[in-house]
């Protein structure tokens, strides 16, 4: 998967200076980060709606659009895919692959940590119950 996102990222970088009249990517770069963010949010909402409606095929299609728009926003912000992979590795080393860092842990110093042998196990998400946020 990361190879596909790497290729997409490189294609986005190559397309950003094309003619906005013929390139959707160039048009997004021309319109700036706020338009990119709006498109990303729209795609995220579409993924959520399709998932709630149980439309798996639509979730797949909209997820591809979501990843495209995320990659465009990364490129605009100067974020490279390997920056994200490095953060994911750091989090995995701390908590396991299927966990999100709590907000209090976000302020921990960045450490170039080697892969930790004793990680938390990967957990199945199907058995978890949804909690309502307040």
From Swiss-Prot:
Protein EC: 3.6.1.31
The entry's keywords: Amino-acid biosynthesis, ATP-binding, Cytoplasm, Histidine biosynthesis, Hydrolase, Nucleotide-binding
Disulfide bond residue pairs: none
Subcellular localization: Cytoplasm
Pfam families: PRA-PH
Catalytic activity: 1-(5-phospho-beta-D-ribosyl)-ATP + H2O = 1-(5-phospho-beta-D-ribosyl)-5'-AMP + diphosphate + H(+)
Main location: cytoplasm
Any GO BP annotation: L-histidine biosynthetic process
Pathway in which the depicted protein is active: Amino-acid biosynthesis; L-histidine biosynthesis; L-histidine from 5-phospho-alpha-D-ribose 1-diphosphate: step 2/9
GO molecular function: ATP binding; phosphoribosyl-ATP diphosphatase activity
Cellular component per GO, a single term: cytoplasm
Family label: Belongs to the PRA-PH family.
The protein, known as: Phosphoribosyl-ATP pyrophosphatase 2
Gene name linked to the record: hisE2
């Amino acid at each position: 998967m990361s190879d596909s996102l790497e290729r997409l990222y490189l294609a986005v970088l190559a397309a950003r200076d094309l003619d906005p009249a013929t390139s959707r990517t160039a048009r997004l770069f021309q319109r700036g980060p706020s338009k990119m963010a709006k498109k990303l949010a729209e795609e995220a909402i579409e993924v959520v709606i399709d998932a709630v409606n149980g439309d798996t095929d639509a979730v797949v299609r909209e997820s591809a659009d979501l990843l495209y728009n995320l990659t465009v926003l990364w490129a605009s912000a100067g974020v490279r895919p390997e920056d994200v992979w490095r953060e994911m590795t750091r989090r995995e080393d701390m908590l396991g692959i299927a966990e999100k860092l709590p907000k209090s842990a976000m302020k921990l110093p960045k450490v170039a940590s080697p892969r930790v042998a004793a990680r938390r196990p990967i957990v199945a998400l199907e058995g978890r119950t949804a909690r309502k946020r307040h």
